[in-house]
Amino acid sequence: MKVGIIFIGTNKYADFFQLYYPACEEYLAPTAEKHYIAFTDQDDNEIFQKDRVTVAKIKHYPWPYITLLRFKFISKVLNILEDMDYCLFIDADLIPQSPISLEEIFGDKSLVGVCHPGFINNVGPFETNIHSTAGVLNEHLNLSTYCQGCLWGGRKNDFFQMVKVLSERVDKDLSNNLIAAWHDESHMNRYFAERRNQVHTLHPGFATPEQGYDHIKKEYETKMLHLHKDMKDYPRFEGAGHGRLK
């Protein structure tokens, strides 16, 4: 089996590849043949000169565009992933901690996401603006699970379809002067809510925050760790609505 792994890291986020690549090589689908696409503004950085790594150069966008536009970035390199059986996007700062089999990741469903550690037993912050293509109000959708945008993917053809659809939806929102509350995560959750029975949902231990969330660490095995970052050095995360167009 071949798995395509997508990394996006510009500015200081590129440095995470030094942890990301060896951890994925050691722990993630160890029996599979893994290929990486690294989107970065540092295409000449030697940290990306690794086996089975293809570098795709992008410029560094300010928050929230660097995350909002990820579907568009990926949609432009689908030809590189054509030979893959599965494709998986993993945040630059989400690092595998223990062996994770191919079956464990993807299950028997066509898509995969991870339950958001902050919204396990309650409804998550789905987009409520009916004018956004990510909006979930006035729709008959399954909102039983809210996933975090740090980890998602699926079988190749289903992944390709998801990327294409969400790239188009984000473009439509931007053309209408709209940005969803949680950017790409809002669009991903709308897409999953439309086809819940096709989504294999990983437990929150696949997105364990490095700091806090002790209840998550007690209840679930930490399979992947979301590294803690000083927001002064990594000013990427600004919270809901930051950068929203009116």
Where in the sequence are the language-model features?
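N-terminal anchoring/stem segment of glycosyltransferases
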Residues: 1-69, 77-83, 227-233, 241-246
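Short, solvent-exposed loop/turn segments at secondary-structure junctions
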Residues: 10-13, 43-45, 60-61, 94-96, ...
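Short catalytic/ligand-binding loop motif for oxyanion handling, primarily in non-cytosolic enzymes
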Residues: 15, 45-47, 96-99, 104-105, ...
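Conserved glycosyltransferase catalytic-site signature
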Residues: 67, 71, 94, 181-188
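GT-A fold catalytic core of metal-dependent nucleotide-sugar glycosyltransferases
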Residues: 71-122
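Feature marking well-ordered beta-strand scaffolds used for ligand recognition
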Residues: 124-128, 184
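Short, flexible, basic/aromatic active-site loop/helix in glycosyltransferases
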Residues: 128-144
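Catalytic core and acceptor-binding pocket of nucleotide-sugar-dependent glycosyltransferases
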Residues: 139-230
